[in-house]
């Protein structure tokens, strides 16, 4: 399966990220580039290059935009996803992350582990929603979907 070799964030329409959000973005991009699978499905009306691809993520008009370019830099796909299906899971994810960061400072390991398990469960739900929303637009594995969901969370935070 093909993969992503470059990921960028177009946040020109968003408020400037906080230093913490900027750091989360950098970590999410690094993790995604370390290991991912990304393929465009075949279409009758166009040839689909095998990749590798570059991806720019943006939020425009309250929609998540995937702008995909091929190895030569030419756009090979652009698709828009409604943010609606992500809103609650992103909100839940940020709330549980805040609880986790607070817990690390003052709770025993057993309670931290319980919060972390809940965080992973919400993260998995977000990845599943993303897989469903990408159906017919891009083919990714569950690990790539998880990493993309993390990036969507930090992008969505500024929207």
From Swiss-Prot:
It holds the Pfam family UPF0262. Coiled coil: none annotated. Transmembrane segments: none annotated. It comes from the Bacteria. Belongs to the UPF0262 family. HAMAP family: UPF0262 (MF_00678). This is UPF0262 protein Dshi_0980. It comes from Dinoroseobacter shibae (strain DSM 16493 / NCIMB 14021 / DFL 12).
